[in-house]
Amino acid sequence: MSRVKKLLVAVCVAFLLTGCATPSLYLDRDLAARGIAGKNGFTKNLIRGHDFVLLSYVRIGETGKPLVIYIEGDGLAWESRSRVSSDPTPADPLVMRLAALDPSPNVAYLARPGQYTSMGASPCDAKYWTSKRFAPEVIGDIDSAVSRLRDMAGAPSVSLVGYSGGGAVAALLAARRGDVTGLRTVAGNLDHEAVSKWNNVSPLKGSLNPIDIADKLKGLPQRHFIASGDKVVPSYVAESFVEKVGDEKHESITIVRGVTHYSGWQDKWRDLLDIPLY
């Protein structure tokens, strides 16, 4: 084997061992999200933080108006219960579709670490889409990205929408920021310890937990959507969370019939957006 071939083999093995995604693994998923964004007036931006490069899509209709930011879920973090995915880019761009349906003048979509980014663009350590998906350094860079998006829109405030694990991120951000005027979660993982126990999977060691800061969200207008057919995040997770916020009667919770954790949200989203925050 020539020296060049040996070098190429070594490089390929290194990529496999570090868990980085090759272009062929994420290209189709990237094109799907990009297509939705392009058809609905969104432009692509890469936001470089201290530790991560985060992808965003932004649609600015009226500079100076509030900005609604949709935060992606955990994506394809695991290929099976025992095998970590080499690319956490979502297999289904559900959150991008929800963002595209939002009639607000200024809307942004924000991906999580490792999603929609090629090799070398962002850290390749799979712990940031598994056990440390809500680590302080992750939340810190997403927080900075939210500020960048807000400034891009010239927005006086932001409203956060988070799906699944993105709901956890949105809640954690809302607790640390002073410019958040509303919080919506969709099948949100608002207590990852409880969700891990429910699914009989390993706990997320090194991750911040939204339930621990729920009391800091008292007084913030919010709405938590629970899927009636959710087998991933049980309803008691949101119920326990809002009780800690101070909503003993669960008035900030809406149970959505005919949807599951993964499907059905798109068809109902416009109507769900009309439900006022509590």
What residue ranges belong to the model's regions?
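N-terminal cap/lid segment of alpha/beta-hydrolase-fold proteins
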Residues: 31-61
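Catalytic histidine-centered segment of alpha/beta-hydrolase-like enzymes
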Residues: 259-268
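Alpha/beta-hydrolase active-site loop
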Residues: 123-152
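Short, surface-exposed "cap/lid" segments of acyl-processing enzymes
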Residues: 53, 59-111, 116-118
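C-terminal motif of bacterial Sec signal peptides marking the signal peptidase cleavage site
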Residues: 18-19
